[in-house]
């Protein structure tokens, strides 16, 4: 199945479908367009050279190399992450299983519907090999402020979540978790490397390849047919 991006159809939580200045801020300092004329200093002789950089794409080499390494990874299965209890988990344990990877939050307007539907989908398909990997993130409106134990208690007590929940991560900016660098580099869509909001979703096939990316406004139930296709493949 070739990767595709399910486009945004409606605004959510007050954010328009097009990237806003707020979401643009999550790009961090590594990616910027510039139309100014700049001076470049040669460190060997101290000479400044005036040059035009109109429409030049500026990329900090350090951040670029991090993204390049993530893109070079062959699949999701090449990564090791920490679970909600701080234990290392090699994602190769999920080989042969379709995955839905979601950045979650406990205090979002999308929390109740997403957690409820995710739990129902997991209960329905877990015995067929389907897995949901939830990554808490506090980058969107500060809506996941709790500690890992608090997040775990919330998800497992209120929504009876049985799917794996992992350590809190950044999904945008210079501290982006390696797994999310990989997901975004393989499923850019029109948003490029920006995660728009809580509950954005990546569907991964049995070989660890990203095959679909869904905006936060796509409910888990809307993804069910795509999950069934991967289970049958």
Swiss-Prot record:
Transit peptide, from-to: 1-69
EC number: 1.11.1.9
Active-site residues, record numbering mapped to chain: 108
Catalytic activity as recorded in UniProt: 2 glutathione + H2O2 = glutathione disulfide + 2 H2O
First-listed, main subcellular location of the protein, grouped into a coarse class: plastid
Annotated Gene Ontology cellular component terms: chloroplast; plasma membrane
Pfam family, one: GSHPx
Family per similarity comment: Belongs to the glutathione peroxidase family.
Designated name of the protein: Putative glutathione peroxidase 7, chloroplastic
Encoding gene per record: GPX7
């Amino acid at each position: 199945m070739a990767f595709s991006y399910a486009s945004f159809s409606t605004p959510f939580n007050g954010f328009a479908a097009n990237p806003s200045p707020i979401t643009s801020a999550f790009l961090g300092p590594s990616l910027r367009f510039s139309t100014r004329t700049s001076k470049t200093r040669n460190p060997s002789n101290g000479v400044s050279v005036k040059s035009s950089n109109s429409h030049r794409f500026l990329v900090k080499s350090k951040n670029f190399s991090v993204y390049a390494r993530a893109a070079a990874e062959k699949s999701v299965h090449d990564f090791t992450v920490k679970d909600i209890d701080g234990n290392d988990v090699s994602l190769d344990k999920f080989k042969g299983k379709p995955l839905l990877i979601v950045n979650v939050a406990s205090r979002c307007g999308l929390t109740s519907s997403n957690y409820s539907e995710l739990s129902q989908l997991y209960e329905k398909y877990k015995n067929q090999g389907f897995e949901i990997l939830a990554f808490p993130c506090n980058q969107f409106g500060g809506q996941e402020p709790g500690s890992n134990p608090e997040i775990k208690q919330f998800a497992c007590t209120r929504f009876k979540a049985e799917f794996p929940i992992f350590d809190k991560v950044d999904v945008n900016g210079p501290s982006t978790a390696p797994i999310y660098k990989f997901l975004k580099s393989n499923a850019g869509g029109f948003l490029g490397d920006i995660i728009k909001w809580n509950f954005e979703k990546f569907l991964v096939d049995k070989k660890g390849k990203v095959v679909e990316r869904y905006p936060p406004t796509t409910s888990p139930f809307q993804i069910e047919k795509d999950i069934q296709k991967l289970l049958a493949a």
